[in-house]
Amino acid sequence: SLFYSLPWGWWTFTYGYSQSDYRTRNEASGFPFKLDGDSRSHQFRAERVLHRDGVSKTAMSLGLSHQRTNNYVEDTRLEDQSTRITETQLGFNHGRRIGSGFVNLDLGWQQGIGALGAQGRGHPQAGDPHARYDKYSLTLSYLQPFQLWGERFSFDSLATGQRSEDVLFSPQHISLGGNSSVRGFKDQTLTGDSGGYWRNQLRWRRAVEWAPLRP
């Protein structure tokens, strides 16, 4: 993966690239077969700070992303599971310090378009995913550090969700489960076109006292 950020006055320009490959073997009805595939993703974003003071910051952003995925069974490409998606993004962010706590709000609109070699609309049947879609997202978070009995703690709460009236391809789904969303569900996930979750965490930070681990 690659990430580059360029601040320019009130603007910040970012570019990200990631790629992944997989290869595995499976078996069905006693017959083994090979599965493999790859994914490539480009992401460009321009963010403009609209207002900034000692306790808050407000910004808008525009983005463009392109993702290609290829999946194969015995070197035969699975057309219905291989995608070329180009997406435009419009975002709004407001962060504010309240006392010793921090509140952050993110609003987003994502739309699938036909640029950069994206796949066409085709003629999807009912229940088939669309390459031209609209998706709306909202994330609200709160962080509160505090001390108790001489120890350092922090509490953070995050509520996030997305909504789409279209059937989406899996990379555009919201996913529940794993370390990035709901704790305790590492090997179980739930995905969908629309949904959300609310996560609350309490952290306890303590200095390392064992001499061999001290810097």
Regions found by a protein language model. Give the residues of each.
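C-terminal outer-membrane beta-barrel translocator/porin domains of Gram-negative envelope proteins
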Residues: 72-215
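Gram-negative/organellar outer-membrane beta-barrel architecture
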Residues: 1-99
